[in-house]
Amino acid sequence: NKDYITKHNRFSPPGVEWLYLAIGDPCVAETCALKECRAEAGELFGLCQFKLNEDYSEKTLVDLTIAEDVLYEDLNRQLENSADEIRKREVKKAVDGIMRKGYAKTPDVSDIKEKFTRWAAYTYARLLSKQIFVPVETEDKELMYSPFQCMAQYFLSLGYAGIIYSSTVFSEGKNVVLFDKDAATPMGKIKKINV
């Protein structure tokens, strides 16, 4: 109901109906959901679990949490080591080719593309997750959220179904925003919680 989506959310502007859920261990997800709602003492909340609909089981989510425990130095070292291994391998093949046939074949560096893509994806995800996803402290949510909203629209345009991201208000929590609010349905009973 568009009457209830009148405020900016991290990934969606007013009027856009996307589904925001806390994910992971049920106890952690419950705590995360309450913190995301900015629950205050005396408020009553209803929480339930959701299940991804079968139509969406093959859809791909962008996971911005994939590299949270990886250091930039480790990512760079892995890429450098891979490049060194490939260089040594291709130089050896070239020398062997020249010795046997008098010429060297064009080097095969196709596997560096996979290594570089992984490095770029992890570096980008870590950058977004660790340095950008901080709680918004300003009242101007439109200004603070607009980069995230543009990014979400970009991922949507590429065919992704949503984004997994770390909670900014609960360090142990993870959330998902699904670009189709009907991608998941409630299951089980609604648990009433008096904060």
Question: What kind of region is each of these model predictions?
Answer:
Residues 24-28, 146:
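Conserved active-site and cofactor/substrate-binding residues in soluble primary-metabolism enzymes
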Residues 29-40:
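Short active-site loop/helix that positions an aromatic residue
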Residues 17-24:
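Short, well-ordered beta-strand elements within core beta-sheets of diverse protein domains
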Residues 1-13, 40-195:
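Active-site and NAD+-binding cores of ADP-ribose-processing enzymes
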